Amino acid sequence: MAALVQRIRARAASLPTFDIPFLLILLLLLSYGLIMLFSAGYAVALYRRGDAYTYIRPQLLFAALGVLAMYAASLVDYHVWHRLAWPMLGISLLLLTIVLFMPEYNGCKRWIVLPGLGTLQPSEIAKFSIVLVFSHIISLNHDRMKSFSTGVVPFALILGVVTVLMLLEPHLSGTLLILSIGAVLMFVGGTGLQWFGLAGGLGAAAIAAAVIALPELVPYATDRLASWRDPFADPLGEGHQTIQSLYAIASGGLAGLGLGNSRQKYLYVPEPQNDFIFSILCEELGFIGAALVVALFLLLLLRGMSIAVRARDKFGALLVVGFVVQVTLQAILNMAVVTNTIPNTGISLPFFSSGGTSLLMLLGEMGIVLSVSRQTDMA
């Protein structure tokens, strides 16, 4: 008996040690998101498909697959991604090109239809590949990041190609998110601050040019900008989604109407299971429920940064920073859209919004973070 206990203890000691606080925060976010997805989406699912489980059923499947992918990724030495960085970028560029030949949905070409399997969103894979390849380049050239040729040119070329392909979809929010992730990694990686000033000037010029050309390049974007400035100017058209979202948030008050008791999800808020799920959460769970979501994302960021600081090399640290910043920035952008702080850009809330590709990629990325945490100096 004593020998059996000793073998069990030895086996337990040999198992990989994850960052438990990070894992717990992640599982809380995932569970919270699944509960809210069913609550927010069952009414529209019943109306559209005659099945209240239309959205939650595949999401549960992808959540299970994602957890398995996360566990598998956590067991793999994260240095393997050095070799896979460029192939992943190549795959992303190929998929971003293929999607341009797909049928339009709501005026955009963002999804590749996989017969019998659903849809694939290439921008999700692009975000993943940007973190990989930027971390790879920076970790190999960290002592030369101050120079323009090393610290700016390769990143600008990669971002340029990716963002042009995404703007052709068009996917403005995804483009903004990828540019932000790239900028954060370059800053953390040591790119000279003077180049950020130059990039800021060029970016301002590009934004000015885009605003001038916007009606021709992206016709629907001008309507969204107008509805952002005054959604009540067109309450039954472009402003409808924003107005109904604000009604939902205001109805929630401090403690909300109760889980499942939203009124706005009954075909008032368009896409309550997707981009605007946060407004339904605010209505049902109030300020307290919304504050809990914000706190969980903030804790995920802080714990991720703690892992990055303790990482054994620059590559691991950059991977963690890239992935947790991606999740946090995406959550911030989604909440900003839902509250009409910024124009509606069509961006999902990580771990909450319906979307199998997104959830699978997110959990896989979190598995890489856990892999880095296994090899920290204090693991």
Predicted regions and their residues:
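Alpha-helical transmembrane segments of integral membrane proteins
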Residues: 26-30, 66, 92, 158-162, ...
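Hydrophobic transmembrane alpha-helices and their immediate junctions
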Residues: 287-331
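Alpha-helical transmembrane segments of multi-pass membrane proteins, especially transporters
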Residues: 124, 132, 150-155, 178, ...
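Hydrophobic, glycine- and aromatic-enriched re-entrant/interface helices and adjoining loop segments
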Residues: 105-111, 119, 198-292, 312-319
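Interfacial segments of multi-pass membrane proteins
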Residues: 138, 176-195, 263-289, 348-363
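Membrane-helix boundary/helix-loop-helix interface segments in multi-pass membrane proteins
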Residues: 2-29, 35-170, 335-350, 354, ...
